[in-house]
Amino acid sequence: MSDREGLFGGDDPFEIARKWLAEATETEINDPNAIALATVDASGMPNSRMVLLKEIEDAAFVFYTNYESAKAQEIEASGTASFVMHWKSLRRQIRVRGHVTKENGPQADEYFASRSLKSRLGAWASKQSQPLASRSALMAEVAKITAQKGPNPKRPEFWGGYRITPIEIEFWADGAFRLHDRFVWRKNTSHDNWTITRLSP
């Protein structure tokens, strides 16, 4: 019997991640696709924030944001990021580290078009991470954008996706008496495959 049967069974970490997320969608109170995204600034100081993961592809994880935000500037400078997804209802988590590239083509256009009208207008109105005088100033900008853009605003150039291509994916499941189960998939770039290792809790 394989040491990885059950929750950790299979050799494709992206498929395991999709299965876990599907389970969390049935059990979490809200936002099962929320991730704590970590980046570093120019001085090496870390930054973290919650964002929503929008897709698990065959070889990458995708989220969307404002390209003028602090997170985007830090990603552009380092080309790397990490994140953790944690589900209290399942007592499981996934940790990912990897390289980041932009997704600002048709896929980003399609996702932007799928958002609610108010969310699309909000993306245009928000100068993310910049100082804001007041909430009323923000709402005034939303009203102005609404009048300018009409009912079908296109994706702004300063807004789009990022694709995290992992070098490492760790799956963690709670165990009794802190004897948790942990397996890490590490990318072998020379052979384009994964080395799978059980880790001590």
Swiss-Prot record:
Broadest EC class assigned to this enzyme: oxidoreductase
Residue positions binding FMN: R49, M50, V51, L52, L53, K54, Y64, T65, K71, Q93, Q128, S129, W172, R182
Pathway in which this enzyme or protein is active: Cofactor metabolism; pyridoxal 5'-phosphate salvage; pyridoxal 5'-phosphate from pyridoxamine 5'-phosphate: step 1/1; Cofactor metabolism; pyridoxal 5'-phosphate salvage; pyridoxal 5'-phosphate from pyridoxine 5'-phosphate: step 1/1
Gene3D superfamilies in UniProt: Electron Transport, Fmn-binding Protein, Chain A (2.30.110.10)
Key words of the record: Flavoprotein, FMN, Oxidoreductase, Pyridoxine biosynthesis
UniProt GO molecular function: FMN binding; pyridoxamine phosphate oxidase activity
Cofactor note: Binds 1 FMN per subunit.
Functional description taken from the UniProt entry: Catalyzes the oxidation of either pyridoxine 5'-phosphate (PNP) or pyridoxamine 5'-phosphate (PMP) into pyridoxal 5'-phosphate (PLP).
Self-association and partners: Homodimer.
Protein name according to UniProt: Pyridoxine/pyridoxamine 5'-phosphate oxidase
Organism listed in the record: Ruegeria sp. (strain TM1040) (Silicibacter sp.)
Highest classification ranks of the organism: Bacteria, Pseudomonadati, Pseudomonadota, Alphaproteobacteria, Rhodobacterales
Gene it is expressed from: pdxH
